[in-house]
């Protein structure tokens, strides 16, 4: 079937030599005047059987010579002149009677064309193509003749072979004018015309020839190509063969026929003769040309011998290719003829024939007939069945071998599919059934499956269209999931375990890799239009597939598509990924990895076989056959290639790696970016309003959500998700590394932190990761940050710096809580973190204002320790304890750096000075050069001084906390922003504490202690009375400056903290003459002694002061700053010393010559000297170089080897007293000026306080060395500044004694230091340095120091929602902006409240109440109060001072405005007063009084005006204290029995969640916070939304402020719906206020309710902890109590409304009461008549009227809409409009109703005005099915019900009037046997009971006004209505309610 003969036409003419040929008719004229064309298909058996070698050589030479033009045209014909030597089989001959014409013949495999004209001349042309025998050729000859204008012609001869133009040669066309007499094809000319070869033997043709086309003119290359392409089997569609091709049944043949018909239409005019073999009949073949079919006079060709047509391809008609398939099947089932395997040898034999048979079929189907037959007989399905049988049978019989290892079968199948060229649909079907169906091949060996997939990869380049049409991507993905699984699924086929063997995981993964390569090639070869669909398939696959190996590889495939070199395609795939839901898919994958990663091991187990292989077995069947596996391993087919594939086992983190790589690629390519700006902290504003405020799109939100989900996934499962591979990938994506497979090359300088979003995820995840990973990450990031300044800058400029690294440090310390020792590696990690921070901050130390970075680092640590995190208990304590430890080590490291750097800068500046001096510059230029060189030193010194102040801040704070450590914290609250210095402001002495310590502690924190009784007794006269002058002095002494205001100016830390407080109180009173000792008693100092001092210090494990290493480092830094190597003082050029080489640095001099830096350095030096003196040898400087090992870190020493070396160098300098002299040198050397008085006065006060506390109370020097060090400079200052200080008269005591005026031994030149110190211990000296001038100067300096320590806190910013790891507090935001802020104290806060405003507040209210009834008789407005009674009645109205008549809503608004403008009323003054009171009134909220017991409606004073508000605001108004803390924190009184355990007082945050407070007039968004003691609602000011700027007339302040409720105030909880979602809770308090909160979803509501219940509110009854209405109703026995008449009808209905979810707070679901009565027409209403009651069994209300109900049913049945479902009622029985219809007359519903009606009341039906008419409308109107809604059923009891004038709808109507039914006017209601209406919950039926009581009748009136007259409104508002008795309420409550409306 694959022979050469089969490639030609199916039918052909056979020429068998001289006895055969075609003889054609002649023509009366020469038909080829313009040229000719000849075309045919020919198969030549032999060219020259007798041709010798010489003849062949001559022919080849002749052809070559003819091509080169070196031989004449006649030469080829004269090659041989011998007789019978030339064999030239003719192709055709066209001759005239005189032998003129054209001939073509073969000469030794070359085609020769000869032409002859008159006079015997002839020419010939040899073509160079060598034809081969026994091969089919399409030969076309075309001779053109183009006649010129002048008779010249341009002729050429063309040769076509197989449709292509092979050769074109110039050849003159003969001019022939004679008729055509002889036409011969394949035979000799007749004897009468021997032709052009007369001298040679006539040679016939031995060949087969297809159809013969003779054209009478050239047809051109294009037509010749089409003629060759359609083949020789096509019969033209004209002549006798017309219509035959249309018998085709497949598309291919039909398309070919259509194309052929078009070609025939073009060729029909050119053709001269056409004879087709299929038309042969006997010895004659008719002419099939157009002229022959038309009946032209032509004689058909006749054969000179028997000629017959042959058909070589007999398959389409005799056996078909499918007949070979039975040879591949050994046996079949007899019942269904399905193949089966019974005999192994026969099966193997038939299998060996499979590949050759498939190849034979591939050749056979090339023929159109076979192709059509294969389609008709469903060949692809049959082939697939046979192939599956072959593979399964062989696999079942060949277990011990490599299953199916014959790759020839794969090649045969591939050849079969590729051989199909003419029928594309059949090819697609073959691909689907044979190649793409992995089920057939799944039983094969790994090698054979890989061969198949590799073949498919190669076929993508040639068969992409067929594979695309076969939907190869989806088919392969489905097969991948079903057959290449690692986790068993329901739909997966376990074909790998037919023999019980296990699969190799590596082989499965390798096959998946090969399969995805096919998909990648298909996607790359497709047009961009297919990208979206292909990616959608991939995304759907990874969403649904639980196979982690497949998901990871598909993600890697997407990554390769996005980062491919072709930028256009990469862009297309990236955009398609995003638009096809790629971001959402990644979100799902992240969530799945968090939830299911730990469950993967439950589905399969990995078993090591022989120590090297990993296989997969189903759970519960892990047993492996050792023999089978041994055979598999030792099999010959198991090559090293298989072994390498088995090592292709995934890590468990490959999915996360794929996600991160894909996200990183999309970010790096610019596809995932924010349009709202480059913010690194994208997660902090994720769920907030940042995106909306900054114009963010939904795409920005999705990108941020993706990054947020990735972060939360790492935090939720760090050990499983944050692995080494994931970390490397994430860090590589952050720096945009090209590849991270082999790790990151940190030496590559091209790495930059280009993607801060990904870096932020990594940094925020590190606190949750393992310590090993933390160490690695810190080292890597530090290395990257240090390799380039840009990296360091980008890292430090992140908003999260340094929060993430501090959180690592603090969280690790927190995790070690409760452990005996630190975790392994904690010390190393802590060292690494501190080194990281110090290296980063060292760079800031060299920059201007670099101290801001240090300050921000410390503030961040403070925020993290006290606010950050969510830990409680011991872990929270550990977290707070880490702050001082961190500060010590950080500040100590920076001080070490500063000391060493200052030394280095000294040498730099000195070298620069020497260089400028050597250049002989002018002094001015040299000075400028030195200052420029010293600029870095200026920045360094500035930052160093700030560090010193931070150290002092730390020491002062720790001292205060240590002093208060033994006290009890009464009520700490997380809502307080005050951390330093009043962290524990409320202190009480603990049990067992000494009175001395207790009093000292109390004196530190407060100055409220009075004068001792002994002092008062000493100041009394003989009669025991205290004179007025003495009392004035006592009062003045009590008003002296408290210690808190001056403490920061002293050295108020260390061992003398308590002594300083006591001394100041005592000495400040001495100046007023209070507490003067008697003359006989000894006047001593303030030192409390060594025991007290040691007790005041916080000790480490070795018993040393824990702050001592930090003090030592501060001293070392000051020595490097102020002293030179010789130890001489006078740094900065002061005092003659060179200092650190800073001569000429005026900037540094001015820097340090300011109050705050100077005094800070002085206090630190004094501290070091004081703590050095322990009554023995010096402790501070003795072992400075070797005693640096005191614990200063969390788990490791504070110092390191570098600091020890620095300390060793600095210890060579002189004693610390030299440092004190250097610090005080500016004061000693500066000119005496009054401008420096404050600094000098503060310096002397500080020095004297140290002298005072170094002397004991019995006047003994306790610290002699300290006194010897500080007295000389102290005395020197006093001597120098004595003239100025003596001029301060206020320094004198009450007796007029100024110690600086008189001569004293203390200032004597020969006085020893101890002697001088003891001389200063006197009342005069003590009082002088605590006098008012001294106190004022100290207070100003202390304000500056305290301002640095504890700046004023602004209002806390709104917290970012949905961030559980943060609280409502944000970091300390007030920072010093410039260094100059140290040089002046902070300004005191302004108190805008006048001094007497507190007293005037109440007076304004009372005077307003008195004046108002006299001056404002009109325009009184009211609004409904939210206070409820015990039965939930809202029966109180309160004045609405900001109310309005809403005149703008009326039609005659212009006229009323004119009248109002011309109305003279003396109310202007009152309006001003009311405006002032308005603020006071509206400051109050809904929770008026926190009464828990009693009726809130009953008040003692009936004339007392109720003002809405809260006690917090009342206290604020009356006291003028601007404290934003809740009332519970300011003035909370607790029962002493409740304070049982101090740990219970520790308040912590339990839950924070975004929520919305729903109010009738507005919706306020904020954060709902639950702590262990409170429920807080913090308003988000930016999100605050109100329905109107004026709620009921004004903007209510209580809607905007934060709220806080104690847990003890909670009484009930109910679940609610809001906006048709079950997402809300309503809280009912013990004070009968209620609040409605919406949490957005059911989960949020559930979490909030659970958190509240778990907090165990004491007054929350157990029955209300369950929020299901049925449970609450059953537990409370609501219906039973109503049936027993224990509760009224109203209370029962309100309880039902409450349980049903109706609330006063939501206007869309307001409480409703049903209509009860149905008779509103009768004059007398008989309550005993059942017909007067509504039938409550017919619900809803639309079913009451049968006629209307029938209309509703007809409407329902006839309604047809494709979108809207059928419905009965077009409105709801209780909507917002229906509620406001009834309640529009009372605020705040008036305002709401106006807003709903578009601010116009212009229709009469907009407001409820007639009871009877309303009932009629409810009963008959098709659009009215309203039930009754009410503000409160007992509102009729309040006389002033509504506003005087609301609006007017009609000129003659009054909207304040409501018409009542006529039976309401009767004087008597006979109720002898009347029955009261009661409701039963079960069937809503009415039951009656006898009533024997009489009821007073109402006053008759036709219409009853619901509002009182304007004249007596105020009087009636204070009148309490008469209440009915209990029995009367039970009987007629419902009726009274209906009648009152």
UniProtKB/Swiss-Prot annotation:
Disruption phenotype: No visible phenotype. Transmembrane segments: none annotated. Residues 1667-1941 form the BEACH domain. It comes from the Eukaryota. Residues 1481-1513, 1829-1923 are annotated as: Disordered. Changing residue 1626 to R: Loss of interaction with GFS12. Pfam families: Beach (PF02138), DUF4704 (PF15787), PH_BEACH (PF14844). Gene3D superfamilies: BEACH domain, Pleckstrin-homology domain (PH domain)/Phosphotyrosine-binding domain (PTB). Residues 1874-1897 have a biased composition (Low complexity). Residues 1829-1848, 1856-1871, 1898-1920 have a biased composition (Polar residues). This is BEACH domain-containing protein C1. It comes from Arabidopsis thaliana. The gene is BCHC1.
């Amino acid at each position: 079937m694959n022979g050469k003969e089969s490639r030609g036409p199916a039918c052909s003419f056979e020429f068998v030599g001289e006895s055969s040929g075609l003889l054609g008719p002649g023509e009366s004229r020469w038909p080829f005047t313009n040229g000719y064309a000849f075309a045919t298909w020919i198969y030549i058996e032999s060219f020259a059987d007798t041709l010798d070698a010489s003849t062949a050589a001559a022919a080849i030479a002749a052809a070559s010579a003819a091509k080169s033009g070196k031989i004449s045209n006649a030469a080829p014909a004269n090659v041989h002149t011998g007789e019978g030597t030339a064999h030239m089989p003719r192709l055709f001959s066209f001759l005239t009677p005189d032998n003129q014409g054209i001939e073509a013949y073969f000469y030794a495999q070359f085609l020769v064309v000869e032409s002859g004209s008159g006079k015997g001349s002839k020419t010939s042309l040899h073509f160079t193509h060598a034809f081969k025998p026994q091969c089919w050729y399409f030969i076309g000859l075309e001779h053109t003749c183009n006649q010129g204008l002048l008779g010249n012609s341009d002729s050429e001869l063309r040769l076509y072979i197989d449709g292509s133009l092979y050769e074109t040669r110039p050849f003159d066309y003969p001019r022939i004018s004679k008729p055509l007499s002889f036409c011969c094809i394949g035979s000799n000319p007749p004897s009468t015309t021997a032709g052009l070869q007369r001298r040679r033997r006539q040679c016939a043709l031995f060949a087969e020839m297809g159809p013969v086309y003779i054209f009478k003119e050239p047809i051109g290359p294009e037509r010749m190509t089409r003629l060759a392409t359609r083949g020789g089997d096509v019969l033209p569609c004209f002549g006798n063969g017309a219509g035959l091709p249309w018998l085709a049944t497949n598309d291919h043949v039909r398309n070919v026929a259509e194309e052929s018909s078009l070609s025939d239409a073009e060729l029909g005019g050119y053709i001269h003769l056409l004879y087709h073999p299929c038309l042969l009949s006997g010895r004659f073949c008719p002419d099939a040309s157009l002229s022959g079919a038309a009946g032209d006079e032509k004689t058909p060709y006749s054969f000179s011998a028997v000629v017959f047509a042959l058909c070589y391809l007999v398959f389409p008609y005799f056996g078909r290719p499918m007949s070979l398939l039975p040879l591949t099947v050994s046996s079949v089932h007899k019942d269904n003829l399905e193949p089966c395997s019974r005999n192994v040898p026969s099966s193997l034999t038939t299998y060996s024939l499979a590949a050759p048979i498939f190849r034979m079929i591939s050749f056979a189907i090339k023929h159109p007939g076979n192709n059509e037959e294969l389609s008709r007989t469903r060949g692809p399905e049959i082939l697939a069945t046979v192939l599956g049988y072959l593979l399964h049978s062989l696999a079942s019989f060949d277990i011990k071998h490599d299953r199916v290892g014959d790759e020839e079968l794969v090649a045969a199948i591939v050849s079969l599919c590729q051989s199909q060229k003419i029928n594309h649909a059949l090819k697609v079907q073959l691909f689907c059934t044979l190649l793409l169906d992995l089920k057939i091949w799944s039983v094969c060996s790994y090698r054979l499956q890989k061969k198949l997939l590799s073949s498919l990869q190669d076929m993508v380049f040639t068969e992409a269209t067929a594979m695309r049409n076969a939907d190869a991507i989806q088919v392969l993905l489905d097969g991948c999931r079903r057959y290449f699984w690692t986790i068993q699924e329901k739909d997966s086929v376990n074909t790998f375990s037919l023999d019980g063997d296990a699969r190799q995981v590596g082989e499965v993964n390798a096959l998946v890799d090969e399969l995805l390569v096919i998909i990648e090639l298909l996607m790359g070869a497709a047009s961009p239009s297919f990208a979206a669909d292909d990616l959608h398939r991939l995304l759907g696959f990874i969403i649904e597939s639980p196979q982690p190996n497949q998901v990871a590889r598909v993600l890697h495939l997407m990554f390769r598509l996005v980062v491919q070199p072709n930028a256009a395609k990469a862009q297309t795939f990236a955009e398609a990924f995003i638009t096809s839901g790629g971001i959402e898919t990644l979100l799902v994958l992240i969530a799945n990895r968090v939830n299911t990663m730990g469950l993967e091991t439950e589905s399969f187990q990995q078993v090591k076989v022989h120590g090297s292989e990993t296989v997969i077995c189903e759970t519960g069947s892990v047993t492996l056959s050792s023999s089978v596996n041994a055979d598999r391993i030792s099999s010959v087919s198991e090559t090293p290639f298989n072994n390498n594939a088995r090592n292709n086992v995934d890590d468990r983190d490959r999915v996360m790696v794929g996600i991160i790589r894909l996200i990183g690629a999309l970010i790096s390519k610019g596809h995932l970016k924010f349009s709202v700006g480059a913010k690194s902290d994208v997660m902090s504003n994720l769920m907030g309003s940042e995106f909306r405020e900054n114009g963010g799109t939904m795409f920005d939100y999705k990108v941020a959500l993706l990054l947020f989900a990735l972060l939360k996934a790492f935090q939720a499962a760090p050990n499983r998700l944050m692995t080494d591979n994931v970390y490397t990938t994430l860090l590589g994506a952050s720096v945009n590394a090209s590849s991270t497979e082999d790790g990151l090359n940190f030496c590559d300088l091209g790495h930059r932190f280009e993607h801060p979003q990904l870096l932020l995820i990594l940094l925020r995840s590190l606190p949750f990761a393992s310590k090993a990973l933390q160490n690695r990450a810190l080292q890597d990031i530090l290395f990257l940050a240090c390799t380039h300044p840009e990296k360091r800058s980008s890292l430090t400029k992140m908003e999260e710096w340094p929060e993430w690294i501090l959180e690592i440090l603090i969280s690790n310390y927190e995790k070690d809580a409760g452990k005996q020792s630190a975790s392994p590696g904690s010390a190393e990690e802590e060292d690494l973190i501190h080194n990281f921070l110090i290296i980063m901050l060292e760079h800031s130390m060299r920059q201007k204002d670099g101290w801001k970075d240090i300050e921000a680092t410390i503030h961040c640590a403070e925020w993290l320790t006290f606010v950050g995190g969510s830990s409680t208990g011991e872990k929270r304590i550990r977290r707070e304890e880490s702050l001082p430890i961190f500060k010590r080590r950080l500040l100590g490291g920076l001080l070490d750096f500063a000391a060493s750097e200052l030394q280095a800068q000294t040498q730099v500046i000195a070298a620069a000075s020497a260089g400028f001096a050597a250049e002989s510059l002018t002094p001015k230029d040299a000075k400028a050069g030195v200052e420029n060189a010293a600029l870095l030193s200026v920045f360094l010194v500035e930052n160093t001084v700030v560090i010193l102040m931070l150290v002092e801040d730390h020491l002062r704070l720790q001292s205060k906390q240590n002093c208060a450590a033994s006290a009890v914290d009464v009520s700490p609250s997380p809502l307080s922003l005050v951390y330093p210095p009043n962290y524990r402001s409320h202190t009480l002495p603990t049990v067992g504490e000494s009175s001395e310590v207790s009093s000292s502690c109390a004196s530190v924190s407060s100055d409220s202690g009075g004068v001792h009784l002994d002092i008062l007794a000493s100041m009394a006269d003989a009669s025991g009375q205290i004179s007025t002058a003495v009392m004035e002095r006592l009062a003045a002494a009590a008003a002296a400056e408290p210690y808190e205001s001056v403490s920061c100016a002293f050295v108020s830390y260390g061992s003398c903290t308590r002594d300083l407080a006591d001394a100041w109180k005592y000495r400040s009173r001495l100046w007023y003459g209070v507490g003067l000792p008697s003359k006989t008693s000894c006047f001593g100092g303030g030192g409390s002694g060594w025991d007290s001092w040691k007790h005041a210090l916080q000790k480490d494990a070795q018993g040393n002061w824990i702050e001592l290493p930090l003090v030592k480092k501060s001293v070392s830094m000051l020595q490097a700053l102020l002293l030179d190597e010789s130890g001489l003082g006078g740094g900065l050029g002061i005092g003659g010393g060179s200092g650190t080489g800073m001569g000429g640095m005026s900037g540094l001099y001015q820097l340090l010559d300011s109050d705050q830096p100077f005094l800070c350095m002085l206090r630190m030096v004094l501290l070091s000297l004081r703590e050095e003196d322990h009554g023995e040898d010096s402790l501070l400087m003795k072992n400075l170089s070797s005693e640096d090992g005191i614990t200063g870190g969390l788990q490791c020493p504070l110092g390191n080897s570098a600091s020890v070396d620095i300390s060793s160098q600095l210890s060579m300098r002189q004693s610390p007293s030299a440092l004190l002299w250097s610090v005080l040198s500016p004061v000693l050397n500066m000119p005496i000026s009054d401008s420096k008085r404050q600094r000098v006065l503060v310096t002397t006060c500080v020095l004297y306080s140290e002298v005072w506390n170094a002397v004991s109370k019995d006047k003994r020097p306790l610290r002699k060395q300290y006194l010897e060090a500080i007295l000389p400079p102290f005395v020197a200052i006093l001597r120098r500044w004595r003239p100025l200080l003596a001029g301060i008269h206020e320094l004198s005591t009450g007796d007029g004694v100024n110690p600086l005026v008189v001569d004293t031994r203390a200032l004597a030149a020969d006085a020893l230091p101890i002697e001088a110190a003891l001389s200063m211990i006197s009342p005069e000296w003590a009082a002088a340095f605590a006098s008012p001038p001294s106190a004022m100067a100290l207070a100003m300096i202390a304000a500056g120091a305290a301002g640095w320590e504890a700046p004023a806190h602004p209002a806390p910013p709104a917290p970012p929602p949905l961030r559980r790891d943060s609280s409502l507090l944000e970091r300390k935001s007030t920072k010093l902006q410039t260094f100059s802020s140290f040089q002046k104290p902070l300004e005191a806060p302004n108190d805008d409240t006048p001094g007497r405003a507190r007293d005037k507040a109440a007076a304004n209210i009372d005077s307003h109440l008195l004046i108002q009834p006299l001056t404002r008789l009109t325009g009184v407005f009211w609004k409904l109060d939210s206070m409820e009674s015990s039965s939930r009645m809202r029966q109180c109205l309160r004045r609405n001072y900001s109310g309005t008549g809403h005149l703008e809503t009326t039609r005659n608004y212009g006229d009323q405005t004119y009248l109002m403008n011309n109305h003279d009323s003396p109310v202007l003054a009152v309006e001003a007063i009311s405006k002032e009171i308005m603020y006071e009134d509206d400051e109050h909220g809904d929770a008026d009084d926190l009464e828990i017991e009693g009726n809130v409606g009953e008040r003692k004073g009936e004339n007392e005006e109720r003002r809405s508000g809260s006690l917090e605001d009342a206290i604020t108004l009356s006291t003028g204290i601007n404290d934003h803390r809740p009332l519970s924190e300011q003035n909370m009184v607790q029962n002493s029995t409740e304070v049982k355990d101090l740990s219970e007082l520790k308040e912590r945050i339990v839950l924070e969640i975004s929520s919305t407070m729903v109010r009738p007039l507005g919706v306020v968004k904020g954060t709902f916070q639950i702590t262990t003691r409170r429920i807080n609602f913090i308003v988000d000011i930016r999100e605050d939304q109100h329905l109107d700027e004026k709620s009921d007339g004004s903007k209510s302040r209580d809607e905007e402020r934060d709220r806080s409720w104690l847990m003890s105030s909670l009484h009930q909880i109910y679940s609610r719906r809001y906006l048709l979602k079950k997402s809300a809770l309503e809280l009912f308090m013990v004070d009968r206020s209620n609040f409605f909160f919406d949490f957005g979803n059911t989960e949020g509501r559930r979490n909030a309710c659970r958190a509240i219940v778990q907090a165990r509110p004491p007054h929350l009854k157990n029955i209300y902890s369950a929020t299901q209405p049925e449970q609450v109703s059953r537990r409370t026995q609501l219906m039973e109590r109503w049936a027993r008449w224990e509760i009224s009808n109203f209370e029962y209905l309100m309880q039902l409304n409450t349980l049903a979810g109706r609330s006063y707070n939501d206007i869309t679901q307001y409480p409703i009461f049903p209509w009860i009565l149905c008779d509103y027409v009768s004059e007398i209403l008989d309550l005993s008549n059942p017909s007067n009651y509504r039938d409550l069994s017919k619900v809803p209300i639309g079913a009451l009227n049968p006629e209307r109900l029938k209309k509703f049913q007809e409407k329902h049945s006839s309604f047809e809409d494709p979108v809207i479902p059928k419905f009965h009622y077009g409105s709801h029985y209780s909507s917002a409009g229906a509620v406001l219809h009834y309640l529009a007359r009372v605020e705040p519903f008036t305002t709401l109703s106006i807003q709903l009606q578009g601010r116009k009341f212009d229709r009469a039906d907009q407001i409820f005005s007639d009871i009877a008419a309303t009932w009629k409308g409810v009963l008959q109107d098709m659009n009215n099915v309203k039930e009754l809604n009410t503000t409160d059923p007992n509102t009729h009891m309040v006389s002033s019900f509504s506003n005087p004038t609301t609006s007017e709808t009609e000129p003659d109507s009054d909207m304040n009037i409501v018409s009542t039914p006529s039976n309401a006017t009767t004087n008597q209601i006979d109720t002898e046997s009347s029955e009261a209406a009661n409701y039963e919950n079960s069937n809503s039926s009415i039951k009656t009971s006898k009533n024997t009581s009489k009821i007073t009748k109402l006053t008759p009136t036709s219409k009853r006004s619901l509002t009182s007259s304007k004249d007596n409104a105020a009087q009636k508002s204070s009148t309490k209505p008469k209440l009915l008795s209990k029995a009367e309420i039970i009987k007629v409550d419902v009726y009274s309610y209906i009648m009152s409306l």
